[in-house]
Curated annotation (Swiss-Prot):
Record's subcellular location: Cytoplasm
Pathway it works in: Amino-acid biosynthesis; L-proline biosynthesis; L-glutamate 5-semialdehyde from L-glutamate: step 2/2
Superkingdom classification of source: Bacteria
Recorded GO MF terms: glutamate-5-semialdehyde dehydrogenase activity; NADP binding
UniProt organism field: Pseudomonas putida (strain GB-1)
Protein name: Gamma-glutamyl phosphate reductase
Length: 423
């Protein structure tokens, strides 16, 4: 009798739960040994990885996959090198598990502190890019979590080949293969099952398009770490150094159009707009960036009319919305109304103004004189990241190793009894 998708996912979930107890108590040395061995296995399996990836690319071309998606799907030699380097980098990162902080004596004589512990089992749902398999698996492994990886159907052969290398590394370190499992069915019912197993899965991390993330957020019976959009702003204040502002705003938009930290809306104080915008527009237009502006913007530079929808849009493309605002308060109001709580930056030399912006803008990252494209786990010193969260519960901003752990209280006494002495 053929196993149903639900039975298959239940089997994966049960195995992951059992494996989480093993990896959760594994030593740092054992986890690092698994990561290094997995890197060696990837290096030795380049031919197998390339062959598996070619199957996915051929299927993608046959199915009319767009060139940009085919590019994301490709495992080039450089990308395989990057995956190997990524595994070794995660192995070199400090292990957050077991770290104790804030130990202090209470009047009763007991000591109270907090210890970092793994979350347990993490389900990762993602699209296209097979290198996400390595990023997710390595971070979950190092943070003491088991993981179930459900990649896009277009990368199924690549993901299987990568998972085989990871499991070789786990075996060499004496850890169960179920610490990292790839869902090997392309049936979409598997996603529904994965997000509906709170008895086996502790948290879901979706990485992909808005439709995928909205569906998971709506239907999941398991907590979700996510962000929907990256509608990031740069505000050029009346106290900005304009040379700095031109460079920062240009980099924020053009570093890479397709990342969630790219600037999508530029806000400019009305008192500097006439001096700032013509040169800024010239630079963007030379780069081929399409400008969409409010009426005050269009009175100063050539731009298409911006609509209400533009302020709500994450373009992920060479398109930029520009609005001239009355000042700091209106800029903050605009960001909090239209933004996605991801990353927003102010360009200013005025400390009080910068402090107000950072205190009142409701985003996971707030920046001063810095392009929003710096919103990245590597740039923040976290090493690799599993994603960026715009939620306020558990993790916010780039989610690295520590974001894949939680805290429990540690209480140490020497026979103290409550209700006696100073209690």
């Amino acid at each position: 009798m053929t196993e149903s998708v639900l039975d298959y996912m239940t089997r994966l979930g049960r195995a992951a739960r059992e494996a989480s107890r093993v990896i959760g108590r594994a030593s740092t040395a054992q986890k690092n040994r698994a990561l290094q061995a997995a890197a060696d296995a990837l290096d030795a399996a380049r031919a197998e990885l390339t062959a598996a990836n070619e199957l996915d690319l051929a299927a993608g071309r046959a199915n009319g996959l767009e060139p940009a998606l085919l590019d994301r799907l490709a495992l080039t030699p450089a990308r395989i090198d990057g995956m190997i380097t990524g595994l070794r980098q995660v192995a070199s990162l400090p292990d957050p598990v077991g770290a104790i902080r804030d130990m202090s004596y209470r009047p009763s004589g007991i000591q109270v502190g907090k210890m970092r512990t793994p979350l347990g089992v993490i389900g990762i749902i993602y699209e296209s890019r097979p290198n996400v398999t390595i990023d997710a698996a390595s971070l979950c492994l190092k943070s003491g979590n088991a993981t179930i990886l459900r990649g896009g159907s277009e990368a199924i052969h690549s993901n299987r080949a990568i998972a085989t290398c990871i499991q070789r590394g786990l075996a060499e370190a004496g850890l169960p293969a179920a610490v990292v499992q790839v869902v090997e069915t392309t049936d979409r019912e598997a996603v529904g099952a994965l997000i509906s197993m709170p008895q086996f899965v502790d948290v879901i991390v979706p990485r992909g398009g808005r439709g995928l993330i909205e569906r998971i957020s709506r239907d999941a019976r398991v907590p979700v770490i996510k962000h929907l959009d990256g509608i990031c702003h740069v505000y050029v204040s009346q106290h900005a150094d304009l040379d700095k502002a031109w460079n920062v705003a240009f980099n924020a938009k053009t570093y890479r159009y397709g990342i969630c930290g790219a600037m999508e809306t530029l806000l400019v104080d009305q008192r500097v707009a006439e001096r700032f915008l013509p040169e800024m527009a010239r630079r963007f237009q030379e780069k081929g960036v399409e400008l969409r502006g409010c009426e005050r913007t269009r009175a100063l530079v050539e731009a298409k009319p911006a609509t209400e929808d533009d302020w709500h849009t994450e373009y992920l493309d060479a398109i930029l919305s520009i609005r001239v605002v009355n000042g700091l308060d209106q800029a903050i109001e605009h960001i909090n109304h239209y933004g996605s709580h991801h990353t927003d930056s102010i360009i200013s030399e005025h400390q009080g103004e910068a402090r107000q912006f950072m205190a009142e803008v409701d985003s996971a990252s707030v920046m001063l004189n810095t392009p929003t494209c710096f919103a990245d786990g590597f740039e923040y010193g976290l090493g690799a990241e599993i994603g960026i969260s715009t939620d306020k519960l558990h993790a916010r901003g780039p989610v690295g190793l520590e974001g894949l752990t939680c805290e429990k209280y540690v209480v140490i006494g020497d026979g103290q009894l409550r209700g006696q002495g100073t209690c």
